[in-house]
């Protein structure tokens, strides 16, 4: 409904929660041991290198009370641990099973079966920030409500997907936008 296109630009972006979960899933795929030992990830040799903006950290907590992914052990019986996977935007750890860890000459992180209870944190937001607070902090930028296609290349790290959403101006939704590429 009267959606407009945007010219090419670099702006802050806020993804709706379900889309942010999908992006986090793509990160886990790229940082998984299977992708790494097959050399099918752009994160090979990525430890201790910047990956995200400096305000982003990602924690894993397999012991989170009542967490959907909580458990004392992974699918191989290896005890997991609470850890920072990304700290200040820097990649600090991979998601390794016993098998993938051996193939890489590393130690299992207790991630046979995947990641457990990931928490994305940002120094630019607070845990009690609601949607409106996040829009205010975004200021002027793009709120993405839909992603189209599967334009993710895990080997190179290239990411190109169609998107639509809303242009945000001064912390308020201003205009619908469509036919944009991220």
Which positions does each model-derived feature cover?
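Internal alpha/beta scaffold segment
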Residues: 1-27, 31
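Dual-mode signal for accessory low-complexity, basic/Gly-rich regions
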Residues: 6, 30-31, 44-182
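Mature, solvent-exposed C-terminal subdomains and processed small-chain segments of exported/organellar
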Residues: 31-41
């Amino acid at each position: 409904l009267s959606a407009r296109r945007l010219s090419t630009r670099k702006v802050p972006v806020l993804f709706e929660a379900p889309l942010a979960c999908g992006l986090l899933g793509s990160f886990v795929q790229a940082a998984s041991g299977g992708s790494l030992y097959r050399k099918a990830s752009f994160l090979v040799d990525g430890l201790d290198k910047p990956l995200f903006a400096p305000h982003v950290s990602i924690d894993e907590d397999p012991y989170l009370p009542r967490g959907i992914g909580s458990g004392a052990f992974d699918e191989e019986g290896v005890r997991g641990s609470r850890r920072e996977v990304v700290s200040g935007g820097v990649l600090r750890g991979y998601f390794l099973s016993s098998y993938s860890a051996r193939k890489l000459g590393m130690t299992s992180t207790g991630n046979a079966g995947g990641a457990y209870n990931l928490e994305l944190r940002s120094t630019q937001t607070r845990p009690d920030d609601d949607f409106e607070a996040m829009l205010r902090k975004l200021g002027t930028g793009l709120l993405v409500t839909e992603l189209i296609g599967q334009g993710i290349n895990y080997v190179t790290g290239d990411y190109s997907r169609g998107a639509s959403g809303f242009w945000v101006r001064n912390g308020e939704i201003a205009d619908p936008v469509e036919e944009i590429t991220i």
